Amino acid sequence: MLSMQLREGDKMLTLLEQAGKMGASDVHLTVGSKPMMRCQGKLLPIADNIVTATDMESFAAAVLTKHLNTEFKRIGEVDFAYSLNDAIRCRMNLFRQCDSIAAAIRLIAAQIPTCEELGLPQTVCDFTALKNGLVLITGPTCSGKSTTLAAIINKLNEEQSMHILTLEDPVEYKHAAKKCIINQREVGSDTKSFAAGLRSALREDPDVIMVGELRDKDTMSTALKAAETGHLVFATLHTGDAVTTVSRIIDFFPENQQQIKSQLAACLQGIACQELLPNAYGNGRVAAFEIMTMTPALRNLIREGKVHQLESFIQTGIQYGMITKADYIRKLQQEGKVQK
């Protein structure tokens, strides 16, 4: 069992730094339990000590601003970003349970990885060459969507001269200006909502808009409008494959599905669905992708509502950079990157 003794002072912040050094992706703190970290998808104890109510009250006092503390007291939960040190940023969710404070914390490397370091498929990297339209990075929670998007934005920042505007909840990776001007807006503090930020973005002369999550009908509708009007829009959804992704978007609009099918057929440029699998050595994880790029045939299928036929076109679309997740996993197995 991984173990360490907590030091005096701000115990929880010290613990987070240690978890980061151990390669943890997440930390969970609950009064009455040992502090836990998620490594390679598995929950493990970080320390032998039991987290106390005093520990969590001290931790909350250390990380919450006056505004966040007011919100936390008002609604019992708050989501925000926190810079732990020069190497690690955190996406923190503090919440109340059983009359005590608990926390779920995502640890994020401050250094933004490149597309090459992540091993992203070339088709995904090539999304940066698009001039307009909608590109969706999808997958379950903790599948690396935010990291993939950060690498894509970083590639644009290094290679092109443009205005990039991001809408995030909260801001995870911070981008320093290179060739691009980058404005990163945080939902809650910089803008009221994703939808409000998107509507405002249309008046802020962006070339690229990144939306942290298409949460609702209003956000989806505005993202489609932005993509239609000449912007390149990157966004995420919690879907596992391309067919489900297209169906989810259409289902957002039960009252005018034909219009949405036509809009989506016109502006969708690509979908990359990802999930993380244990690598063959048991000491890390590898991303598996399903990739759909757009051809005239695929646009016609979406326009005509024949979404169920998309998968067969993806299976035979290798010359367009397409691949199903099943085929991608078989490829990883053949390369010895994951176990059969």
Please report, for each region that a protein language model flagged, where it lies by residue.
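Short, flexible helix-loop junctions that flank or precede catalytic/ligand sites
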Residues: 2-340
